[in-house]
Amino acid sequence: MAAACICQPNLLEINVSDGPLDMIRKKRKIQQPQLRPPLRENKCQPHFSVRKVNQSYIISLHKEITCQLIAEIVKQKLSRIWEKVYIPSYELISDKDGNQIYVEQSVDENRLTSEIMEKLDPNNIDIEAIEILFDDYHLELSRLTNGIIISSANDHFYREFSFNNIIDDNFKICGTSMSADSFDKIYGVMWIEVPFNGNGLQNDSAVNRVSTSHNQIEELNDIEQEIRAFNISRSNQESIIKKEVSRRLNGR
């Protein structure tokens, strides 16, 4: 996967809404309801940032690729190819009473792990993980503001992004990639391109100031992030495959 479709652009100020703007609370002649505690943050929800690149806004969504997700993908794929990569061999030996029996020969687990890694291809596993993360994400043009709405039913995610420049309606997903933070967590990244025509709705001198979610992932160079994330993911995959190979060989 190539991460270089976006140069190092400036971050900018936008307006972000957590829910539909056309919901109006009606007055009711009943006692006031008790205050409820705030909803617990959904850890599946993505971090996001917005950048301006030439004549487009680029919205970046980041979601963590957990070891659990990688393990599920690896085990599924390994089940499909196991009988092709592992073909047991037997040696005919005689016991102390002269009886001939077949004994399964030992297997080089490291060699088998390397062969499986090559057949599964770490890149394909990363791509599948990112597809799963953003599988039900939906993009639509806002009817109330100059912006777009990004939502996900699975992640209970709803964000409305409104912009100062008048946008075109041909926004699209322009690519996916990976990134890594300083704690060696890896993230799937989805980029959404929102073109604008250059006409501003208002004179805003703060267009290049930062405005992102409070949990924004540390900003590093995109290509460096992807390379680092790939290396971490490859190490995680190899560890998972080794454990699964050992389990299958010793538990067969």
From Swiss-Prot:
Q: What is its main location?
A: nucleus
Q: Name one GO biological process term.
A: protein localization to nucleus
> Which GO MF terms are attached to this record?
protein-folding chaperone binding
What are the record keywords, sorted? Nucleus, Transcription, Transcription regulation
* Keyword field contains Nucleotide-binding: no
Keyword presence, Nucleotidyltransferase: no
- What GO cellular component is one of the record's annotations? nucleus
Where would you find this protein in the cell? Nucleus
Function, as annotated, reads: Involved in the curing of prion [URE3]. Nuclear localization of this protein may suggest a role in transcription regulation, so it might exert an effect on [URE3] through known prion-curing chaperones or BTN2.
In Swiss-Prot or TrEMBL terms, this protein is called: Curing of [URE3] protein 1
Its source organism is Saccharomyces cerevisiae (strain ATCC 204508 / S288c) (Baker's yeast)
